[in-house]
Amino acid sequence: MVSLATRKSLPKVKAMDFITSTAILPLLFSCLGVFGLFRLLQWVRGKAYLRNAVVVITGATSGLGKECAKVFYAAGAKLVLCGRNGGALEELIRELTASHATKVQTHKPYLVTFDLTDSGAIVAAAAEILQCFGYVDILVNNAGISYRGTIMDTTVDVDKRVMETNYFGPVALTKALLPSMIKRRQGHIVAISSIQGKISIPFRSAYAASKHATQAFFDCLRAEMEQYEIEVTVISPGYIHTNLSVNAVTADGSRYGVMDTTTAQGRSPVEVAQDVLAAVGKKKKDVILADLLPSLAVYLRTLAPGLFFSLMASRARKERKSKNS
């Protein structure tokens, strides 16, 4: 049986509930509105940041680099496309300029042909790049090579080749272009690394080592360039459906020539390129563009290293068994 005091308090409780609900809902919608406005301003600022920016992209003739060229071009950037194959670069420029789907003013790209493993060529290429527009706003270090093999079977020459392409080449090009950015107190360095720059998986030692080195170098660079107002972004994709595994080198330096299942099931390079564009436009510092499990593995490596190492050892046993069967 409800007491008289309880009956008297019920209207007060209902009134308080009504006041609380009517106060919280507008506050909630206001917060959502502010968040939406913030995201809209981020999007607009990112678009403005990329429009007419001089963007250099290495490894632009295929895979992620080619798709990055397309999205940066469509965003109105002034492109300098780099690669080893001049014919493929010219074909890409014809493909870009033939498109009429862009909503902003576009600019005919320049091309610079050179090999990232040739230190002498990099110095000359940097000078040629600067001659195109007189300066560089954004450098996208995308070119790279993958690797498959056991550590014991892999020659040191192969280790060096992977490091030259994935680490020393981008470092040399970055150092060659940095003085012009420092002089202007303006610039943005982007390193397309890999999830394997944060975790290491078996039979990828040379590749993982080169990407770990990339992560470390550009993290250091970010801190050192802060005083010059130069941005540094490290992007770590997971598996992307490109020919990266097909063109990978093996333990003896020969071409792997196989599309791995994980690569075949990877994300579309078109989607990843859009994410790269967004990350650069928002000036993000460090971005992981991988599926849930690889992303969780990054945290597992730190929070439960013993479990992570056991899982990698198990993976190595399974891969070894499948190759021997």
Curated annotation (Swiss-Prot):
The chain crosses the membrane at residues 18-38. It is found in: Endoplasmic reticulum membrane. Residues 39-325 are lumenal. Its EC number is 1.1.-.-. It is a single-pass type II membrane protein. One of its GO terms (cellular component) is endoplasmic reticulum membrane. It comes from the Eukaryota. PROSITE patterns: ADH_SHORT. SUPFAM superfamilies: NAD(P)-binding Rossmann-fold domains (SSF51735). InterPro entries: NAD(P)-bd_dom_sf, Sc_DH/Rdtase_CS, SDR_fam. NAD(+) binds at residues 62, 64, 207, 211, 242. Substrate binds at residue 194. The active site is at 207 (proton acceptor). Keywords: Endoplasmic reticulum, Membrane, NAD, NADP, Oxidoreductase, Signal-anchor, Transmembrane, Transmembrane helix. GO terms for molecular function: oxidoreductase activity. Putative oxidoreductase. Belongs to the short-chain dehydrogenases/reductases (SDR) family. This is Dehydrogenase/reductase SDR family member 7B.
